[in-house]
Curated annotation (Swiss-Prot):
UniProt subcellular location: Cytoplasm
Protein name: Elongation factor Tu
Region annotation G4: where it falls in the sequence: 136-139
Gene: tuf
Pfam families membership: GTP_EFTU, GTP_EFTU_D2, GTP_EFTU_D3
Organism: Bacillus cereus (strain ATCC 14579 / DSM 31 / CCUG 7414 / JCM 2152 / NBRC 15305 / NCIMB 9373 / NCTC 2599 / NRRL B-3711)
Region (G3): 81-84
SUPFAM superfamilies on file: EF-Tu/eEF-1alpha/eIF2-gamma C-terminal domain, P-loop containing nucleoside triphosphate hydrolases, Translation proteins
GO biological process: translational elongation
Region (G2), start-end ranges: 60-64
Enzyme class: hydrolase
Region called G5, residue ranges: 174-176
Length: 395
């Protein structure tokens, strides 16, 4: 049979393997590519090729991540696998690897372990919306009742963190046996991917989301009005749209976009990814500033207090050399601006060491346009000392 051409026309989904160390995440990743390669949907990648993940220096932090791609009959997937636990924490908090869904790998021989719990919590905090479970190493467990027990444990754990534990697909297999080409176990990999296809929805495209553009610069054009420039983060903006100016002010201002310009050309509309200048009706030069956002009316609000999942850079990564304590007041960099904020640590936590990851409550001195999942960095005098993601809005 001739190899099917690698089509780009299929919907694209980003997924990743998560779970405890040595439960078989990387072996499963290798097994998926190897099994799908037989149907022409992937390039087979061995365990060693994936395990030797290159270290990526993403914004000064070192993250080891393996990226593989493959396709099923209906979709094209980009799949990330991280060798170390710290790599997951960094990856998920900085959004270096955005996941539309995760495959949670749990060894049937060991059951859920500390990092199983941690990765589920992390997925919840950073907004990985869907999880499918692969119970691995089932060839090592003869007792059917034991398998059912482990499955129940995993489902309970998922429910505990707000995932629909009872409804999540759980596939029992053996990544190693599938990798070695045993047909019965290969079938389990096919079954896993069929569940991933069916259970993890195709993400909404950036252009289908409500319009949002962080303001980078503002200038006035004599006789025309005020122009805000920036890169459209999501959605589409058309001439004539009513938008809100959000953040750094007591209340949102509303205005109409009377012109959209890109590379000095006038456009009817701009979309996610475009760098534009938006001409705003009736807005004075001093009514809008860098750090605010332009957004579709009612789509996003300004908030000052929120809970966040944060990881603090180690000394080696260019971070602080000393711990910080409650009431620490660094700058929080959201999109295009720094805002000072005060940190509250969880009960029982006295201090945070460089290299830690922790949930904290942050109160900014001025409200800013944020939502659950908004990423930020923590800075001191222009130097980045940590990264975070908004987990829940408090007020």
């Amino acid at each position: 049979m001739a190899k099917a051409k690698f089509e780009r026309s299929k919907p694209h989904v980003n997924i990743g393997t998560i779970g405890h160390v040595d439960h078989g995440k990387t072996t499963l990743t290798a097994a998926i590519t190897t099994v799908l390669a037989k149907a022409g949907g992937a390039e087979a990648r061995g365990y060693d090729q994936i395990d030797a993940a290159p270290e990526e220096r993403e914004r000064g932090i070192t993250i080891s991540t393996a990226h593989v791609e493959y396709e099923t009959e209906t979709r094209h997937y980009a799949h990330v696998d991280c060798p170390g636990h710290a790599d997951y924490v960094k990856n998920m908090i900085t959004g270096a690897a955005q996941m539309d869904g995760g495959i949670l790998v749990v060894s049937a021989a060991d059951g859920p372990m500390p990092q199983t719990r941690e990765h589920i919590l992390l997925s919840r905090q950073v907004g990985v919306p869907y999880i499918v479970v692969f119970l691995n190493k089932c060839d090592m467990v003869d007792d059917e009742e034991l398998l059912e027990l482990v499955e129940m444990e995993v489902r309970d754990l998922l429910s505990e963190y707000g995932f629909p534990g009872d409804d999540i697909p759980v596939i029992k297999g053996s990544a190693l046996k599938a990798l070695q080409g045993e047909a019965d176990w290969e079938a389990k990999i096919i079954e896993l991917m069929a569940e991933v296809d069916a259970y993890i929805p195709t993400p909404e495209r950036e252009t289908d989301k409500p319009f949002l553009m962080p303001v980078e610069d503002v200038f006035s054009i004599t006789g025309r009005g005020t122009v805000a420039t920036g890169r459209v983060e999501r959605g589409i903006v058309k001439v004539g749209d009513v938008v809100e100016i959000i953040g750094l002010a007591e209340e949102n201002a509303s205005t109409t976009v009377t012109g959209v310009e890109m590379f000095r050309k006038l456009l009817d509309q701009a979309q996610a990814g475009d760098n534009i200048g938006a001409l705003l009706r009736g807005v004075a030069r001093e009514d809008i500033q860098r750090g605010q956002v332009l957004a579709k009316s009612g789509s996003v609000k300004a908030h000052a207090k929120f809970k966040a999942e944060v990881f603090v850079l180690s000394k080696e990564e260019g971070g602080r050399h000393t711990p910080f304590f409650a009431n620490y007041r660094p700058q929080f960099y959201f999109r295009t601006t720094d805002v000072t904020g005060i940190i509250q640590l969880p009960e029982g936590t006295e201090m945070v060491m460089p290299g830690d990851n922790i949930e904290m409550t942050i109160e900014l001195i001025a409200p800013i346009a944020i939502e659950e999942g908004t990423k930020f960095s923590i800075r001191e005098g222009g130097r980045t000392v940590g990264y975070g993601v908004v987990a829940t809005i408090v007020e």
